[in-house]
Amino acid sequence: MGCTFLPLESAFMLQFTRCFGSRTANKGFQLLPDFKLKCGLEIHTQLSTQNKLFSLSTNDPFASANLPNHHTSFFDVSLPGSQPKLNPEVVLFATKLAVALNSKVNLNSHFDRKHYFYADQPMGYQITQHYSPFAKGGFLELLGSLDSIDENSKRIQLVQLQIEQDTGKSVYRGSEGRSLIDLNRSNVPLIELVTQPNFTDLKQIRAFIKKFQNLVRHLGISTGDLETGAMRVDVNLSVNGYSRVELKNLPNTSSILSAIKYEYQRQVGLIQSGEADKYLSSSETRGWTGSSTVKLRSKETTIDYRYMPDPELPSIKISPGTVQSVSQSMPKLPDAVLHDLMSEPYGLALKDAKILAIKGNGHDQLYTQTSLLKYYLDTFSCYSTLAGQQLNPRLPTNWIIHELLGNLNRLQLPLEKAAEAFPPKKFAELLMLIQDDKISKASGKLLLFHILNEINKLSLAQPVDLSALIEGFDLNVIKKIDANELREICTEIVGGISDPKLIEGIVSGKKKNSLKFLIGQGMRVSQGRIKPHLFEQAFKELLKVKW
């Protein structure tokens, strides 16, 4: 049967490609109303504990390729006589995730052995929780206002969370004709999350993966990176109630979505051609090649894992008080933080709120999301006190997100170091100087960069003196200027314009917006110290503009 199935499938796929070639995995895809997609996800997440799951080895699965098998112990490599000892930090991390996902923690969960033979699994079995998982049920709520889905809300129900150990890693050296084994990843703690098949479109799947990544990063239990393998996603998919197909080898979100698109189209094609009963009547596992899905195994060849309770490990017994204590110590979850930031008095746009509240992995060496959010909230509080009724919520938002973060990245200056010499109170004072027109926005930007640059070079530890800097660099806004001096500046700017048609257009009124160009030149020359309306008035008088 196996010998005839693959050629037939290949022949069909050739026909399918001809019929549906325009519906590629990345272009022109749409779900058809008569062919209902149903998806569930299985997500394996590596936990960022200090040590591995059942040993004292350092948990560093991404150790340099020059140090293979470096972070290993006797148990990790399965030397005879070595025994597992549960890492309690794993239990804490698992409890945090279960609470955040509204799951019911099993107060007496057990470990089991899942038997199979593979080169990077030296024990011949994996320790997992097949019969009595760590937590059951729960959900993750997707919101249209936050997660870019079509529905107002979509609740994705969860089946369970279970603790298990990761395998080693096979490194294929094709040029040498051999495979190498790196056990740095062996026995790294994983949490496997299994969802109900509640997903009915791609937006929901993309949103769930992103939201789950944000959650584990926010809780500080994992990096959540798909590209490095710290998070791995398998997809269970069916169309119109036919048998489930499991998709594997999905290294990133793009691959996950492309594989689902391709597999959906493949199954729709089989149903439309009347061959669904032949090819979709039993479950199978398929891999993603980057352009198509290929069969790995079917129900008939499913491995018998011979699960059995692990006799060397006791149960994980947790008291209700422990779960309650963990719950009470949890930080606000991302959705709650976003809601707060988008409400009064902050009134942030969703994009800006996510920059402050959602942890990314690009700037970990400069600031944590917790420290950034705290700096913003403290600055806003100080500014609010100073501004009183003149509060402009956008001012601290724009200056922290765009100017402060931009300069920190440019200078590679950690926020913690910057905050020592330029604390939130001082930042609020700078904002008030700008708001009260004591200095221009342009001068404020120059001043902020100068302060951060000096902190970076000199490691300043004391708060800066803004008044002294403004006086020293002569940055005060010029509210009154001698008319002749201003006319002289404008005359010099107009004389430097090489295109006479620009001036003619301004005078005639045909190019009124070109006057803004001249004003901009004046602002540049004066470094923003002369107000724009003074330049506008002076240019109109100089050019005898009558409109």
Swiss-Prot record:
GO biological process, one term: mitochondrial translation
Pfam families in UniProt: GatB_N, GatB_Yqey
Localization terms from the record: Mitochondrion
Reactions catalysed, as given in the entry: L-glutamyl-tRNA(Gln) + L-glutamine + ATP + H2O = L-glutaminyl-tRNA(Gln) + L-glutamate + ADP + phosphate + H(+)
Protein family per UniProt: Belongs to the GatB/GatE family. GatB subfamily.
Phosphoprotein found in the keyword field: no
Enzyme nomenclature, EC number: 6.3.5.-
SMART domains in the record: GatB_Yqey
Annotated keywords: ATP-binding, Ligase, Mitochondrion, Nucleotide-binding, Protein biosynthesis
Protein's name in the database: Glutamyl-tRNA(Gln) amidotransferase subunit B, mitochondrial
Miscellaneous remark of the record: This protein may be expected to contain an N-terminal transit peptide but none has been predicted.
PANTHER family, per database record: GLUTAMYL-TRNA GLN AMIDOTRANSFERASE SUBUNIT B MITOCHONDRIAL AND PROKARYOTIC PET112-RELATED (PTHR11659), GLUTAMYL-TRNA(GLN) AMIDOTRANSFERASE SUBUNIT B, MITOCHONDRIAL (PTHR11659:SF0)
Primary subcellular site in the record, as a coarse category: mitochondrion
Listed InterPro entries: Asn/Gln-tRNA_amidoTrfase_suB/E, Asn/Gln-tRNA_Trfase_suB/E_cat, Asn/Gln_amidotransferase, Asn/Gln_tRNA_amidoTrase-B-like, GatB, GatB_Yqey_C_2, Gln-tRNA_amidoTrfase_suB_CS, Gln_synth/guanido_kin_cat_dom
Subunit structure: Subunit of the heterotrimeric GatFAB amidotransferase (AdT) complex, composed of A, B and F subunits.
Role according to the record: Allows the formation of correctly charged Gln-tRNA(Gln) through the transamidation of misacylated Glu-tRNA(Gln) in the mitochondria. The reaction takes place in the presence of glutamine and ATP through an activated gamma-phospho-Glu-tRNA(Gln).
Molecular function, one GO term: glutaminyl-tRNA synthase (glutamine-hydrolyzing) activity
A GO CC term assigned to this protein in UniProt: glutamyl-tRNA(Gln) amidotransferase complex
